[in-house]
A protein has these predicted regions:
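Aliphatic-rich helix starts adjacent to a transmembrane/signal segment
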Residues: 2-43
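Low-complexity, Gly/Pro-rich coil/beta segments used as flexible assembly/activation regions
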Residues: 40-174
Length: 174
């Protein structure tokens, strides 16, 4: 009888530990799916900008699944000569590491260089992604684009639900 009681206690402790592991895996699985989707949204913006010649200043329009038409500005400036801070050209501020500075408020990013893109999923679920970019004119024939995206709810660094922002960079020319 005593052995059965001890076995049941050990089993209960083991199942309790397994339930916490299960919850952590559910959180990280959802986080991974949002991380993949934010990379795809950033890639979409990158492809749209890269499709134009480097010296083009033509604005593009992208429509999300909520029907919002977002303007994508393709005008860049030389490094430290535009709105992107000391390390960027035009657009969202860049850090010294050359990535989008997520400490900058969304409203502080110049119009045409940020959007809150809505992605629709199964069952009417929607996820909003904060997408920002910076364009650095390297010469009259070359431009560097840095695009970053993350879910809007990922405002805190660390934790199980934190999604590392995707940062994509390319150099396009004529």
């Amino acid at each position: 009888m005593l052995e059965s009681l001890i076995a049941m206690i050990v089993l209960a402790i083991g199942l309790g530990g397994l339930s916490s592991l299960l919850m952590a895996s559910l959180y990280t699985n959802h986080r991974s799916s949002q991380d993949t989707s934010s990379t795809m949204v950033a890639e979409h913006v990158l492809e749209q900008i890269s499709a134009l010649p480097a010296n083009s200043a033509t604005a593009l329009t992208v429509t999300d699944c909520a029907g919002t038409a977002w303007n994508i500005s393709t005008q860049g400036h030389a490094q430290a000569a535009g709105s992107g801070g000391s390390y960027g050209g035009d657009g969202a501020t860049l850090t010294s590491g050359g990535v989008i500075d997520w400490t900058q408020a969304y409203g502080a990013v110049p119009a045409g260089y940020a959007m809150q893109y809505v992605d629709c999923g199964n069952g009417g679920r929607q996820t909003v992604y904060d997408v920002r970019w910076d364009l650095i004119t390297m010469s009259s024939y070359a431009r560097m684009a840095i695009i970053s995206a993350r879910p809007t709810g990922a405002t805190v660094n660390g934790g199980l639900r934190f999604v590392m922002p995707a940062n994509l960079r390319t150099i396009g020319g004529m």
